[in-house]
């Protein structure tokens, strides 16, 4: 297990209250030994003007997952900040919900790199994102 902080899904979701994460409807759904998952609705909150999932919403889901996963790997007195994010969009989604799965590519003492893959309800890859973070403290 890679996590140094121990939080329940309920506690993880409580951190979203009053934030953009809550506004977008992002909900943490699974905390595995080396992965963190969340869902996000594809609706008017996350659509672009043509009725498809906005690429920025996908990036927000990816950064939410990567940042929280990074935080969970740190000790008291440390925090994680994002330094770079990329997102490759593979497939359009117009309704339902998407599921993001975040796993580490690199866990160093001062930096981390996370891969976040976003799937549609049929399990098809819609977006592949990579988030780099720095550990402070």
Swiss-Prot record:
UniProt keyword list: Cytoplasm, Hydrolase
Gene3D superfamilies reported in the protein's UniProt record: Hotdog Thioesterase
HAMAP family for the chain: Thioesterase_EntH (MF_00907)
A cellular-component GO term for this protein: cytosol
GO molecular function (one): 1,4-dihydroxy-2-naphthoyl-CoA thioesterase activity
Protein family according to the UniProt entry: Belongs to the thioesterase PaaI family.
Organism of origin: Cronobacter sakazakii (strain ATCC BAA-894) (Enterobacter sakazakii)
UniProt xrefs under CDD domains: PaaI_thioesterase
Protein name: Proofreading thioesterase EntH
Subcellular location: Cytoplasm
Higher taxonomy: Bacteria, Pseudomonadati, Pseudomonadota, Gammaproteobacteria, Enterobacterales
Classification via InterPro entries: HotDog_dom_sf, PAAI_dom, Thioesterase_EntH, Thioestr_dom
Subcellular location, principal: cytoplasm
Gene Ontology BP terms: enterobactin biosynthetic process
Catalytic residues in the record: 63 (nucleophile or proton acceptor)
Entry EC number(s): 3.1.2.-
Pathways involved: Siderophore biosynthesis; enterobactin biosynthesis
SUBUNIT field: Homotetramer. Dimer of dimers. Interacts specifically with the aryl carrier protein (ArCP) domain of EntB.
The keyword Ribonucleoprotein appears for this protein: no
Function: Required for optimal enterobactin synthesis. Acts as a proofreading enzyme that prevents EntB misacylation by hydrolyzing the thioester bound existing between EntB and wrongly charged molecules.
């Amino acid at each position: 297990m890679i996590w140094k902080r121990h939080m329940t899904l309920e506690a993880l979701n409580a951190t979203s209250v009053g934030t953009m994460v809550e506004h977008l409807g992002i909900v943490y759904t699974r905390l595995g030994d080396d992965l963190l998952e969340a869902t996000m609705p594809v609706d008017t909150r996350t659509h672009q003007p043509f009725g498809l999932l906005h690429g920025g919403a996908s990036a927000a889901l990816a950064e939410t997952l990567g940042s929280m996963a990074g935080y969970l790997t740190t000790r008291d007195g440390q925090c994680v900040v994002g330094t770079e994010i990329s997102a490759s969009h593979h497939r359009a989604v117009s309704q339902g919900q998407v599921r993001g799965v975040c796993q580490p590519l690199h866990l160093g003492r001062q930096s981390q790199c996370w891969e976040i893959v976003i799937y549609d309800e049929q399990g098809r890859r819609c977006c592949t994102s990579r988030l780099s973070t720095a550990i402070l403290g």
